[in-house]
Amino acid sequence: MASRYVAVGMMLSQTVVGVLGSFSLLLHYLSLHYIGCRLRSADLIVKHLIAASFLTLLCKGVPQTMAAFRVRYFLNAIGCKLVFYLHRVGRGVSTGTTCLLSVFQVITVSSRKSRWAKLKEKAPKHVGFSVLLCWILCMLVNIIFPIYVTGKRNHTNITVNKDLGDCCGRGNNKIAQTLRAMLLSFPDVLCLGFMLWASSSMVCILHRHKQRVQHIHRSNLSPRASPENRATQSILIPVSTFVSSYTLSCLLQVCMALLDNPNSLLVNTSALMSACFPTLSPFVLMSCDPSVYRLCFAWKR
């Protein structure tokens, strides 16, 4: 009984904090538009990341909280299909836009003499198309979920279905479950690889730039960190947060796919880890965005 209340409290807290963070970041961009600041091309990616995080939190947090409260049959078959599908799409777009943001940043910070010189000028023009393509691909890849998931009120024979809280998954074929888990994990693994490559490339570029201007920093007596160090922190903090949370989430998702009837602890832990990055990402992005501090000074003036 106590563990159920702990699960309810954690899910509610995570959902509320994540939604408030998403609204705060959205309000931040609206405030920048209000005071006349020109938004960057990367801000469009961040806006879609906010939308995907918000979608993930609502579609995972609310049903899991209702299931933890033991509200039976909160969702019917159509509701289960829609909620699981939107959650997977939001999760995929969150992964894809974070990866896209990392790749866009490495193209932006690269020098004009590098092999990314041609992409440096074209990249801002194709940000919108890239984000739209990310949404379309996630919708197509996760189309299997409306076929696989259904509501418990429509299927009382739980022995042939996988328990997913208020919903259930059809079938218990081990081979099909393994293939499905590999198919759904492949885009996440691919995005993680691109993200690690982009982040390491950016850190190397900033380190080389710092070495070139080392004599300038030696003459600067200010105790503040160099711009390269601050930029490196703004790169590594979001990526490390994403990689750690989504790696654990992917492992738990694979375990749930391979088990016939995962217990409530595994289901609740997987739900918490799935919403971990969407909850933290608005605060991480705001802490690493210098425009937040410019906005604060603008309001003070």
From Swiss-Prot:
Highest taxon above the source species: Eukaryota
Annotated InterPro entries: GPCR_Rhodpsn_7TM, Vmron_rcpt_1
Residue spans, topological domain Extracellular: 1-15, 70-88, 148-185, 256-264
Pfam families: V1R (PF03402)
Cytoplasmic face of the membrane: 37-48, 108-126, 207-234, 286-301
Gene Ontology molecular function, alphabetical: pheromone receptor activity
Keywords: Cell membrane, G-protein coupled receptor, Glycoprotein, Membrane, Pheromone response, Receptor, Transducer, Transmembrane, Transmembrane helix
CDD domains named among the record's database cross-references: 7tm_V1R_pheromone
Topology versus the membrane: Multi-pass membrane protein
GO biological process entries: response to pheromone; sensory perception of chemical stimulus
Sites where a glycan is attached: 154, 157
Keyword Cell membrane: yes
Cell inner membrane keyword on record: no
Annotated family: Belongs to the G-protein coupled receptor 1 family.
PANTHER family: VOMERONASAL TYPE-1 RECEPTOR
Its biological purpose: Putative pheromone receptor.
Name by which UniProt lists this protein: Vomeronasal type-1 receptor 4
Organism listed in the record: Pongo pygmaeus
Gene: VN1R4
